[in-house]
């Protein structure tokens, strides 16, 4: 299975699609929000600038998220103002670029993200914990697949929005399910109706091992997406075993997610991916 075959509205013209990240600056309601130095107008302006750089550098899609809203609220505790601001930022990005756009709302705010996606026209939602559970920096995170899949049905969005679901996601403790392998968790996502599986390393900037990616690939038919640590140096090796990648830190100056997107870093990465695509033809 390859991601462009998903019957859920995503459309990428190339194999091994690469999704770049647009990290919205602190949104209204979050502790770091400062309307004097970074109001919504400036937040949107910066997001549009970075989305355009990513598109011009050759990425196949972008994902918008509220990464700066630390410390994160969880699930149903995510505030209305966060959802509203994320929806506005997402909608602006969607209308500013011609490539597909997705969304994530921290922490595991898949219902808020789905509401934004349906309202604005995003093609996918990243879900940190579709099934099973883990301990995040925000505390215990429970599975949300049952609730958000029913919400998608109520909104008649089965053919327009898909769920990209992490397994053994970065930045968390998975001791409570340590007797379940990553491969078994990937099989759970497939059995429980997820549309794709995201495989990560331990934290942002750390890649998954080739063995982890390939072992998941061997067990399921869903697309496998790399979710952390992909760089110009390892992109070809890892993407040989995966169907796509979400790249955040590597496209930023000094490999730091808090810094601006850098065109040349992104372009160099995409050249490596384009070489791989040529070799696979």
Question: At which residue positions do the language-model features occur?
Answer:
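Alpha/beta enzyme core
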Residues: 19, 24-76, 81-101, 108-222, ...
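A short, charged/proline- and glycine-enriched loop
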Residues: 14-17
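Short gly/ser/thr-rich secondary-structure transition/capping motifs
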Residues: 2-3, 226-228
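Eukaryotic N-terminal low-complexity, Ser/Thr- and Lys/Arg-rich leader segments
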Residues: 1-7, 280-281
């Amino acid at each position: 299975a390859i991601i462009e075959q998903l019957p859920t509205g995503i459309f990428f013209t190339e194999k091994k699609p690469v999704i770049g990240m647009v990290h919205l600056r602190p949104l209204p309601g979050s502790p770091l929000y400062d309307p004097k130095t970074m109001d919504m107008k400036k937040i949107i302006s910066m997001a549009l600038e970075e989305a355009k750089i990513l598109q011009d550098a050759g990425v196949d899609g972008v994902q918008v998220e509220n990464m700066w809203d630390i410390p994160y609220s969880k699930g149903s505790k995510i505030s209305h103002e966060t959802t509203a601001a994320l929806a506005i930022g997402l909608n602006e990005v969607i209308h500013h670029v011609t490539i597909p756009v997705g969304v994530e709302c921290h922490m595991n705010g898949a219902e808020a993200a789905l509401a934004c996606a349906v309202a604005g026209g995003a093609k996918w939602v990243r879900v940190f914990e579709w099934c099973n559970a883990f301990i995040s920096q925000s505390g215990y995170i429970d599975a949300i697949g049952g609730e958000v899949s029913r919400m998608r049905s109520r909104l008649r969005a089965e053919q327009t929005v898909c769920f990209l679901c992490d397994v053994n996601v970065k930045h968390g403790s998975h001791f409570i399910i340590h007797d379940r392998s990553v491969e078994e968790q990937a099989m759970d996502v497939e059995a429980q109706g997820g549309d794709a599986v995201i495989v990560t390393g331990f934290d942002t900037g750390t890649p998954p091992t080739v063995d982890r990616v390939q072992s998941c690939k061997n067990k399921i038919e869903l697309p496998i997406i790399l979710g952390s640590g992909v760089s110009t140096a390892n992109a070809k090796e890892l993407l040989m075993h995966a169907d796509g990648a979400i790249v955040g830190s590597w496209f930023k100056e000094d490999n730091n997610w808090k810094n601006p997107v850098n065109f040349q870093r992104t372009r160099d990465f995409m050249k490596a991916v384009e070489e791989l695509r040529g070799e696979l033809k």
